[in-house]
């Protein structure tokens, strides 16, 4: 076989699967395509001696050694046997129908007999029309189709030519022989099935008694005594006509006409284009109507009963439908399936060159802060949608995984004073978020703190025992909390109508000022916007981030059990949701997860949240917590002016070594309210001393930006605010640690407890 070496195709003869398809594609670039079929090695060697002139240029050639053997030894014997069987059944009396009984003087069987020469459609005419009509139509249609497709460039749409046994069979000859051969075989099969049913049933035709001429006198009994006759009492001279009168069900004219009409109609539907809107329906309806008329003439001329004709239509149409769909593949070219398979096996280079399949690369670094924040917020949506674009069967495509895990973006947001942005919200299908309205009543806060103090005293020993437990195996977790000035709204399964850019991520291990050599972490108090209601956004646990530690699992079970018991009572008391969450944490204890490093700092989120009165209109600072900082961007930016007392700058003050823990207090909202009772515990005195140190500094307008890099974590509880880090600081909720600033003589000192002033020009970098 002459190989198309100009295209770099491999010269193997027996190739299967994707190798054969690539060989065809490569050889087509050089002007010819050499197709090989399974087991085609012998035919390829026989065709190796053919010169290039013997092969038509620009034609698709397929070598096969199974075409002629199958045709000679399988298809022709089957067709010949069906023709021979039909001959014996139709033209000889070798097989006779059974003798079925009839009633005496039955009027339905006494219709006049019409000679074959007087029939509207004789049997020979039926055979000629049923065989020759569709066969000629198919051959003419294939010739026109071949001429039209041959004029196209590179013969697009043509089936490959077959080179078998040194003979070249073009697509016209192959398709015509295949379609006409199946049609002839279908007609023979339909006639055979009809004859077998007729011989088996022996139902009489409407003219049976006319040609039979029964001799009722030969019976032992009269017709009045026994009206149903099963004996052969026919006295007619023409036995052939009498036997034909016993083969009425089903009608042979109806079956053959229905088969021919349905088969040729399917051919027209598959091969004709939609260029002419009326030509295809015209041809289809013409053949269908001809078949129906052919069957109805058998009823009008008393050759068959109506039920015989209707059943013949069903039998012939069913056989034609089966052969048209499964024997000839609905008359579609066999190359279509190969082209579809080739598209699925395209190489990676072809996919890169195809603009419709190019995967858009993600730019991980950005100099613009807003664009970077929006990219973080929309990462889950992009990662989820990118997976659907990579599902291509049987395609060897190397998928580059993203740099960060997908679908694990747990975030912390303190958005009480954050500006609103008109960016599309990102719905996370995993977390279920809720926004709960918090009360602003200072008297109520004082009453709750008194109750917590009494409950905390009784559980101090149990909490100390939990503090000494060994470290859990759960990785650090992230929390998501949202404090907003919007009205109370609750959303389940991500159905909350809030801007998506207000969800940021924080990891306490990256907070500046945390010294690993010290036992505690920094203290931060965040002031709320004046006159705003508080919305605290607490996510439930995610499905993929669940710790497998035995101790953390037991703590989680304790937390969930307590939450179920206290939901009803908390709602009945009409307490704020954030107060209920903190109360549960004080009652049930803390979810313990000690850091791996014994000297690792700990940041505890306590429940001593105080409320800011609605009449306080002092200026408030803006704290912005951002996640995922880039390498080329500063981690912490604190605009400040000068250092010193009253400068208004934020400072991270290291704790005293005598203190075991420090507190990361959120939303100290009631600094101007009436004094509350201080809880006296083992940690309260140290924190109160640190609070008095900072009481003389004033807080001015300023924006503090804290950018921290989150790490992948696992959530333990559904409504917890505690996170743990292995080496860095940990944000945890302690039930026995409640820090309340002392009462100051002046409102200004009370306001600035836990605060350091900030100024709009200084920036710290980690």
Swiss-Prot record:
Gene disruption: observed consequences: Knockout mice lacking Plppr4 are viable but show a severe alteration of synaptic transmission leading to juvenile epileptic seizures. Excitatory transmission in CA1 pyramidal neurons is significantly increased. It is associated with transiently reduced weight during development, a reduction in brain size and higher mortality 3 to 4 weeks after birth. Heterozygous knockout mice, show loss of somatosensory filter function and altered resilience during stress-related behaviors.
Regions of compositional bias (Polar residues) in chain numbering: 743-752
InterPro entries on file: P_Acid_Pase_2/haloperoxi_sf (IPR036938), P_Acid_Pase_2/haloperoxidase (IPR000326), PA_PP_rel (IPR043216)
Protein name: Phospholipid phosphatase-related protein type 4
Topology class, membrane: Multi-pass membrane protein
Phosphoserine: residues carrying this PTM: 37, 347, 386, 439, 462, 474, 608
Chain segments annotated as transmembrane: 68-88, 120-140, 179-199, 248-268, 277-297, 309-329
Signal peptide: none
Alphabetized Pfam families for the sequence: PAP2
UniProt function note: Postsynaptic density membrane protein that indirectly regulates glutamatergic synaptic transmission through lysophosphatidic acid (LPA)-mediated signaling pathways. Binds lysophosphatidic acid (LPA) and mediates its internalization into cells. Could act as receptor or a transporter of this lipid at the post-synaptic membrane. Modulates lysophosphatidic acid (LPA) activity in neuron axonal outgrowth during development by attenuating phospholipid-induced axon collapse.
Keyword field contains Transmembrane: yes
């Amino acid at each position: 076989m002459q190989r198309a070496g100009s295209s770099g195709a491999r010269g193997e003869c027996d190739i299967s699967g994707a190798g054969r398809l690539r060989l065809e594609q490569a050889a087509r670039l050089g002007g010819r395509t050499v197709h090989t079929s399974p087991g085609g090695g012998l035919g390829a060697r026989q065709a190796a001696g053919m010169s290039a002139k013997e092969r038509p240029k620009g034609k698709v050639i397929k070598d096969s050694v199974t075409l002629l053997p199958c045709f000679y030894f399988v298809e022709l014997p089957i067709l010949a046997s069906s023709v021979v069987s039909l001959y014996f059944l139709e033209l000889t009396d070798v097989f006779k129908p059974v003798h079925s009984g009839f009633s005496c003087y039955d009027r339905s069987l006494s219709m006049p007999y019409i000679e074959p020469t007087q029939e509207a459609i004789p049997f020979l005419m039926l055979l000629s029309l049923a065989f020759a009509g569709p066969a000629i139509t198919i051959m003419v249609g294939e010739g026109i189709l071949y001429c039209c497709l041959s004029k196209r460039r590179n013969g697009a749409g043509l089936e490959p030519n077959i080179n078998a046994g040194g003979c070249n069979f073009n697509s016209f000859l192959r398709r015509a022989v295949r379609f006409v051969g199946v049609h002839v075989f279908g007609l023979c099969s339909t006639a055979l099935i009809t004859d077998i049913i007729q011989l088996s049933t022996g139902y009489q035709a409407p003219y049976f008694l006319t040609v039979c001429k029964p001799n009722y006198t030969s019976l032992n009994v009269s017709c009045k005594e026994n009206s149903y006759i099963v004996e052969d009492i026919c006295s007619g001279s023409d036995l052939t006509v009498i036997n034909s009168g016993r083969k009425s069900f089903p009608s042979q004219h109806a079956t053959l006409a229905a088969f021919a009409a349905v088969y040729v109609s399917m051919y027209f539907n598959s091969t004709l284009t939609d260029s002419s809107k009326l030509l295809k329906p015209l041809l289809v309806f013409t053949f269908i109507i001809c078949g129906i008329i052919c069957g109805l003439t058998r009823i009008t001329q008393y050759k068959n009963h109506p039920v015989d004709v209707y059943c013949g239509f069903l039998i012939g149409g069913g056989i034609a439908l089966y052969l048209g769909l499964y024997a000839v593949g609905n008359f579609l070219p066999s190359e279509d399936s190969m082209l579809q398979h080739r598209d699925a096996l395209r190489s990676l280079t072809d996919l890169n060159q195809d603009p419709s399949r190019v995967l858009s690369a993600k730019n991980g670094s950005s100099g613009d802060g807003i664009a970077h924040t929006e990219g973080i917020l929309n990462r889950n949506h992009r990662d989820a949608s990118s997976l659907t674009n990579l599902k291509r069967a049987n395609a060897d495509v190397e998928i580059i995984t993203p740099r960060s895990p997908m679908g694990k973006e747990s975030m912390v947001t303190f958005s009480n004073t954050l500006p609103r942005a008109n960016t599309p919200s990102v719905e996370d299908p995993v977390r279920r978020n809720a926004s709960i309205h918090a009360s602003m009543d200072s008297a109520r806060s004082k009453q709750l703190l008194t109750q917590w103090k009494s409950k905390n005293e009784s559980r101090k020993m149990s909490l100390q025992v939990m503090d000494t437990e060994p470290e859990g195996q759960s990785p650090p977790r992230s929390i998501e909390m949202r404090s907003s000035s919007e009205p109370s709204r609750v959303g389940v399964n991500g159905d909350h109508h809030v801007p998506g850019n207000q969800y940021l991520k924080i990891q306490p291990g990256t907070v500046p000022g945390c010294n690993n050599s010290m036992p505690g972490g920094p203290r931060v108090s965040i002031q709320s916007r004046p006159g705003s209601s508080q919305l605290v956004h607490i996510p439930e646990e995610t499905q993929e981030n669940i710790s497998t530690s035995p101790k953390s699992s037991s703590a989680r079970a304790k937390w969930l059990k307590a939450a179920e018991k206290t939901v009803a009572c908390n709602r009945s008391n009409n307490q704020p949701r954030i107060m209920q969450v903190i109360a549960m944490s004080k009652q049930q204890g803390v979810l313990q997860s000690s850091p791996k490093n014994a000297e690792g700092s700990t940041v505890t989120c306590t429940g001593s949240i105080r409320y800011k009165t609605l009449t306080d209109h002092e200026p408030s600072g803006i704290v912005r917590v951002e996640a995922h900082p880039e390498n080329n961007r500063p981690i912490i930016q604190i605009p400040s002016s000068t250092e010193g007392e009253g400068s208004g700058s934020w400072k991270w003050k290291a704790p005293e070594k005598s203190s075991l823990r420090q507190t990361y207090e959120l939303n100290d909202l009631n600094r101007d309210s009436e004094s509350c009772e201080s809880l006296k515990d083992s940690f309260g005195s140290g924190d109160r001393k640190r609070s008095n140190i900072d009481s003389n500094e004033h807080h001015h307008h300023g924006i503090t930006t804290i950018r921290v890099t989150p790490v992948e974590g696992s959530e333990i509880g559904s409504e917890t605010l505690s996170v743990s880090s292995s080496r860095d600081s940990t944000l945890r909720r302690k039930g026995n640690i409640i820090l309340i600033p002392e009462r100051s003589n002046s409102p200004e000192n009370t306001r600035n407890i836990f605060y350091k002033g900030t100024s709009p020009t200084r920036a710290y970098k980690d």
